[in-house]
Amino acid sequence: MSGTLLAFDFGTKSIGVAVGQRITGTARPLPAIKAQDGTPDWNLIERLLKEWQPDEIIVGLPLNMDGTEQPLTARARKFANRIHGRFGVEVKLHDERLSTVEARSGLFEQGGYRALNKGKVDSASAVIILESYFEQGY
């Protein structure tokens, strides 16, 4: 086991990506993947899996603030199931509430409005999802 994990922040137009190490509990952003109505370039995801060889994949689970599901929740679950089905890698869902808000805030502090491009926000959200996963002891 390498201790490497990949995280995805699922979206219908852009999917944020981060890679992290379990041993350090840290993550860093990778370029976001463009999606068409939630369908990613599966060849690109396959290349990411071959390059990073993750032990597991974490997919952010979008929930309402009260913990109930929203329309995007089912689509994120489907995305996670497809990754598992196509590539046979272990996939876990992780609560992503407020990750985008936190990502926008952090990027804005670093570079103002210019730093808030969609791909950067999505991948920064994936970093937050993965670091939250590590912080919870997984």
UniProtKB/Swiss-Prot annotation:
Can you cite an annotated GO cellular component? cytosol
**Where do the coiled-coil regions begin and end?**
none
Protein EC: 3.1.-.-
Q: Has UniProt tagged this entry with the keyword Nuclease?
A: yes
Q: Where in the cell is it found?
A: Cytoplasm
Record has Disulfide bond as a keyword: no
Q: Which CDD domains match?
A: YqgF
Main localization of the protein? cytoplasm
Q: What class of enzyme is it?
A: hydrolase
Q: Which GO terms describe its molecular function?
A: nuclease activity
Top-level lineage group: Bacteria
Provide one Gene Ontology biological process annotation.
Answer: rRNA 5'-end processing
Q: Which UniProt keywords apply?
A: Cytoplasm, Hydrolase, Nuclease, Ribosome biogenesis
Instruction: Please describe what this protein does.
Output: Could be a nuclease involved in processing of the 5'-end of pre-16S rRNA.
Q: What family classification does the UniProt entry report for this protein?
A: Belongs to the YqgF nuclease family.
User: What name appears for this protein in its UniProt entry?
Assistant: Putative pre-16S rRNA nuclease
Q: Which organism is it from?
A: Escherichia coli O139:H28 (strain E24377A / ETEC)
